[in-house]
A protein has these predicted regions:
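Broad, structure-driven detector of short, well-ordered beta-strand segments within folded domains
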Residues: 83-87, 132-138, 174, 212-216
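Surface-exposed beta-loop interaction hotspot
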Residues: 132-194
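N-terminal pre-domain segments of enzymes
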Residues: 21-55
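N-terminal secretory signal peptides and thylakoid transit peptides that target proteins
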Residues: 1-12
Length: 296
């Protein structure tokens, strides 16, 4: 979800003035290219369409495979007994079942070996077998295993994103007001956890005759916006959408709602997605960016 900042960086400085002045030919081409890159991200192995499961991993032994006796059940295409995770505190090992070929980060492994755990939402070591990949991550003592599948039903049935028509009226310049010190935001996610993020300031802008305000969080050298509006739960995803921008320059930020996109949770029920804070609910319809096809 915080992954697309590079998609707008290359052309943003050159195109900003042309966009705001209404150079639609260049702008339409840019949006088209952005959407192609976005679609490629969704279909990639790190995207949401490969994800088919998220499981808690308690202390002790957790067996993995397609057999109904396994703690974590995989699709029937997987081996009946892939192996077992052994967790003792923050020490995690994996022992494959004899005869099952597994790789860790692309390297063949055998016998019992340690697994590096990532910090949510970033996974640790990638364990591969057949069409499947599993990885372990942890946060506040909670360990979770994600399962990815090259033949995921979400990937096979994905028809591409739906979009509002490109509209330069939703390309706006906002005034950025920095906070004296970054403000801590408590951001809940769709798995029930709450994370603390830093808001460097807020932005105000005019849209559809309204003066609106959003509070972003800092990501890298840019800003990340989580928002809802009056299309949420109707034409767009009910939990809200995301938007990224460059960092403020001369007290201004360009917001391009034609690049508003859905959280990963819009594509499968297993992703962990931050939920927009209440103050980021806009009292207008943002008829720009990605729509929601439905499905879960």
């Amino acid at each position: 979800m915080l992954r697309r900042k590079v998609l707008w960086a290359a052309s943003a400085l050159v195109a900003r003035g042309a966009r705001l002045l209404g150079n639609n030919t260049d702008y339409d081409a840019e949006i088209s290219e952005w959407r192609k890159n976005y679609d490629r991200d969704l279909r990639s192995e790190k995207g949401p369409l490969w994800l088919i499961g998220r499981h808690n991993v308690p202390e002790g032994r957790t067996e993995i495979g397609s057999d109904s006796s396994q703690t974590i059940a995989l699709p029937a295409r997987a081996p009946k007994r892939v192996g077992a995770i052994e967790r003792r505190g923050d020490k995690v090992t994996f022992e494959p079942t004899r005869g099952i070929a597994v790789k860790v980060n692309g390297k063949p492994m055998s016998g019992s070996f340690a697994l590096k755990t990532g910090v949510m939402p970033n996974p640790g070591d990638k364990l591969e077998f057949g069409d499947f990949e599993i990885a372990l991550s942890a946060s506040d003592g909670n360990y979770q295993l994600t399962v990815r599948d090259r033949q995921s039903p979400y990937l096979k049935t994905f028809q591409g994103s739906l979009w509002f028509p490109v509209n330069t009226g939703y390309l706006v310049e906002a005034a950025f007001a920095p906070y004296p010190t970054p403000k801590e935001l408590k951001i809940p996610d769709t798995t029930g956890r709450t994370r603390t993020r830093q808001a460097p300031g807020n932005v105000t802008f005019r849209l559809n005759g309204e003066t609106l305000r959003l509070e972003p969080v800092a990501i890298g050298d840019g800003l990340f916006f989580m928002f809802k509006d009056r299309t949420s739960g109707r034409e767009t995803y009910g939990a809200g959408r995301y938007l990224e921008s460059e960092k403020p320059k001369n007290g201004k930020v360009v917001l391009d709602f034609n690049k508003a996109y859905n959280p990963y949770c819009a594509f499968n029920p297993y992703s962990s997605c931050p939920i927009p804070p209440k103050q980021n609910t806009l009292i207008t319809r943002v008829e720009a960016g990605e729509k929601y096809r439905g499905g879960h």
